[in-house]
């Protein structure tokens, strides 16, 4: 790692022992490769392959009209340049997409009315616009309406055939009922299943069931063929009073004789009754030459006839195939002289009579009846005819338009049923159906195994490209219907393809998919890790997948085939557990959609470097050793017995039987889990929480890479796109906070500019309102290699992921402030902004055109003091950099009010004084409660044709200046490069012509040539033709580059000056971005990487915190009781190693100081060589070493990869090297008393994250606010500015205290006593503190509810009621 730019800046000590052979695939390759394969933007030489978008068009086109007189064919498609680039789309709130143009060919035929022959009459070709196709950004996301979205890959059941049983749940006897199911990619499902009576049924699309023989009849078999397909036959021949039956040892193997077996020829007993026919007996009988055995009539009774027995002369059928032989039938056959009876080989043990029994109960016996039955099931209520029934049956399984197994389905089917159909055969064949029924019957007979649904060989991944392909196909099919109708209704001779096509349905399908599909998700952009994880997510939910409610335990559980493919740790807690997973680090998806993982090949016990990617199905047949199996220097396996996996089982085998070996110990886990050091020492539940919480870490103002990492940090930072990598090698030309200009040095394509300009993002808002800001890492003049990190992004430091901060932790209780996982922090953490983060809130306001007149954005707002307008410019928009608080005006806006008719006098006054204030109201955008911050950006959007205000013009001018600066810098570098190359060619030449004043045949020198302006150098002409050609080519390239540069600049300016596309009725829109600084405070949630989460309970002055002997105070105090029960010991090991890292940092720091003082590098080199391995320091100069040393002053960063990291002994070695106690415990002193604590305390550096659950976003205060309409109680929730609910249990608490008056006002005037609360308000205003509680509104609601039930409830005054009761006469008298 030392040779990269980042490595030169900070070197990580690596503890991994196992060399990694395979390169880890790019982390977002899943998304990018899939979508590229779908779009295939650049058409290859020989045309596009039949996949992705091409296959969609091919499957829908050609389209013919109903009379077949015209045909619309698809030729090719192309993409044009997107109208706006990614950043422009983000800012304007539009979709990043490219226009799709499709070339279509319309062929019109002449049809001869007599013969029906067709001849081509006309061919027209035309490019048709088919809507915009969203493009993927370089980071694997889509920009839809200005927001970044991710399409999550879906796990679903692979197409193919599956065999299963009901686990004995259906029938009360617990009998296993077997079933087979053929699942196509699209089309009807076919189920074949047994019932409790062992009859085989078939269902199509889960409709009513039919006997399976009806399906076989419909396929064109007759009864005899069905039986001969499923059963062997045995022939019985008459031999006097008995029968002869051929002796077949193979068929009778394992058969137990109930009577003596007698040789039909010799009459000898070959097997006595009660004995079993085993291999030895069979051989002996064979040696005796037995060919036939004797059989009696009793043996024949109960057997089934194999073929129709027919009188050859009269055609009379004596017995049909499948009939059971009874004594009566046998006698009848004897009477007519039948001497040979073929029977089915059914012994009721190895071969059951299931198909024969099904045939017997099936009321159909021919194809027609079977087809009618299938038709009635599929379309109940419609009368079938043979033609419609045949057409419907054909379209169910044999029509490529309606039924598609897909290549995957065909491959899976071939593997499961031992067939060999090409994977282009996408429909079912007769042989497939027969093979499925055969395999099912074999299962019932006890042969073969059922399939495991959760095996990764039976589940596949549908990525973006495939999901999009399916969606687009739906859109095109909707379009097809419209095209057919249009073709039939217009004059086909005069129309062009354009007139037939309405691309709206296709565009709508795409828009609907990206906008509202369950798998199109708002990207989690909290930090770079959460982005990467989101793109690598696999969901079993979504259209065509499972639902939370239906998914059982098995689907969610970890399966042995997940090893190296799906992470067993990272999955959400809660209802989605196990349904949403993450791809493992080395996993990739193959062309069939199965997840593959890499292995090293092992030959004769020697491990090679050859890497093979295998899917779960392929892996099953190999013995796979772990990555940590013992090897010697020659890579030979050293153990006598090696622990291996094979087909989900763990077994021990000899080294020479091992076929494969894992590539890396971390191939088991996902990216997030691979970032947890000492993962192997944590309990799985806590590791799960750790993985999930790293994704919620907020980027902090100052990123700090962990002292104890795993080596994955740099990979995540690079692949996530948070840190910027150089696109080409070159030399840094300019650097400032907003951009880096690199002059490319590698020879590049002449059409590309020789300059790369990298714009850095500054204070951009992410989807989660965290702050995206990038800062440069390079200096002017530094050489940069392609792929090196040149700028850090959010949560990255020196090109490494840095989600949190290293803080000094003490594990000890502290006055109960860390009870129940609470966290105690030092004031230093707040003062030094250790856990301060910046959040950017976006507010927008629109000026609409209303019925009463247009709204106006202005500074002139009625009844507002000048003080309130102090932050607004003359256009009424807040300044950048202004500090705003809750209630401040951000954008002034007035809306016209409905006017009352005016008297003539008023009209006159209005005309004279132009008073306008009375007819408008203030609808300005104000800062919502709870927000305080600084304005970082303002964007103004104007509708086309609306005049721009001063602010919009100022923003536009600024932007144009920025673009002009880019153009000028690029031009300068282009000039410098080109003229330098031209000078190289000309110097030393003696031109025959040149600029004015040049003497012919003078030899040019560097001084001589510089006398002329550079633009005149092109006028030199030399004799050498080759050089002249070179100079001309150079000039042509220079002019073209210049022209391209200018054109690009003009295009961008034109886009800026063009009006914006705003929603209908909106004249102007202003977006204001406020940066809010959030310091850590009590109530914020923090966590480590091991699932050790807690809430900050108190921030203590630094002098009260526990401190070490040298006066160093702890930054954070955690409760030691949080560790043992949760079994996440990794955090303790991390603390120890972090302590050692800081100790080593101190030693290196001293050596660096010595070097800076007296320029002696030796002590520093000795120190560094003691810490790092020689390969890590290879090729470092003294300056580079000093810089590396300087960067590790605070602590030497370590990498301890998962399952392959530092062991206890390594930690102790490091502690000793740092001159610390091997126990890593220290004597601590109480900050308040100065006394030492009773025993030593574990102290060290731990990496803590601040999570996105901030108390500022959760808690708010309300005095008055909105009330619910019906109950008149305050609303709830922060968003509604609601109150805190005083619920049932809180009422009990006040009752328990006997606080009657407090309780009364809680339930009345502070809640829903409408009159009462108004009176209280008035009383408070008057300064009076007496009030009376009335009736709560919710009581009235209850009364109304009871009345609606027909129960009249009336309220009466109890005193008056008592008085009335005394006077009232008896009830009957009153009648």
Swiss-Prot record:
Q: Name one Pfam family in it.
A: RNA_pol_Rpb2_6
According to UniProt, the reaction catalysed is:
RNA(n) + a ribonucleoside 5'-triphosphate = RNA(n+1) + diphosphate
**EC number(s)?**
2.7.7.6
Q: Which InterPro entries match?
A: DNA-dir_RNA_pol_bsu_ext_1_sf, DNA-dir_RNA_pol_bsu_external_1, DNA-dir_RNA_pol_su2, DNA-dir_RNAP_su2_dom, DNA-dir_RNAP_su2_hyb_sf, RNA_pol_bsu_bac, RNA_pol_bsu_CS, RNA_pol_bsu_protrusion
Keyword terms: DNA-directed RNA polymerase, Nucleotidyltransferase, Transcription, Transferase
**Which SUPFAM superfamilies does the protein's record reference?**
beta and beta-prime subunits of DNA dependent RNA-polymerase
Q: Which GO terms describe its biological process?
A: DNA-templated transcription
Q: Could you name the Gene Ontology cellular component terms for this entry?
A: DNA-directed RNA polymerase complex
Can you provide one Gene Ontology molecular function annotated for this UniProt record?
DNA binding
On assembly, the entry states: The RNAP catalytic core consists of 2 alpha, 1 beta, 1 beta' and 1 omega subunit. When a sigma factor is associated with the core the holoenzyme is formed, which can initiate transcription.
The family this protein is said to belong to: Belongs to the RNA polymerase beta chain family.
- HAMAP family of this UniProt entry? RNApol_bact_RpoB (MF_01321)
Function noted in UniProt: DNA-dependent RNA polymerase catalyzes the transcription of DNA into RNA using the four ribonucleoside triphosphates as substrates.
Task: Please state what the protein is called.
Answer: DNA-directed RNA polymerase subunit beta
Task: Give the organism the record lists.
Answer: Methylorubrum populi (strain ATCC BAA-705 / NCIMB 13946 / BJ001)
Question: What gene, per UniProt, encodes this protein?
Answer: rpoB
